[in-house]
Amino acid sequence: RPHAGVKVVSVSASELMELYRIREVMEGLAARQAAERMTDQEIADLQATLDTHERMIDEAQGQAYYQAEGDYDFHHRIATGSRNTKLAQMLLGDLYYMVRMYRYRLSTSTGRPQRALGEHRRIVEAIAQRDGELAEFLMKRHINAARQNIERKIEEGELTI
């Protein structure tokens, strides 16, 4: 049977916004736990990843950040670094891929890749300082900014769900 086991999941705009609100809390928790549990080497690797992302943005005038899975890599490393297996499974499962699909379609938003990189750097600084509370706050604000960006795109008709 062709496509056996392949499931296509679609969501309404309101469901997508609900998923972002759930992600905001879950990714905030992942960032808090990453600050408490990541090794120094993992944090150094995360910082190096952002340096690579910055070069990619510069080379592509900001358009390649998500296309090269840079954003996914950042969030994946933090989810894994939280050492919370269930949380990481939830964040990196089917729903996460669906959310990524919409994020990818929005990655060409003017200035968003540069802003996202700055937000990522501040999150990593908080993790490196082992400040779980600040890392959680910054991650939640980062996901909330992404949600607001998507909401605006839907309202302006630039993104159809």
Short names for language-model regions:
Residues 44, 111-114:
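Short helix-capping and inter-helix turn/linker motifs at the boundaries of alpha-helical repeat units
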Residues 19, 63-65, 112:
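Short N-terminal alpha-helical targeting/association segments
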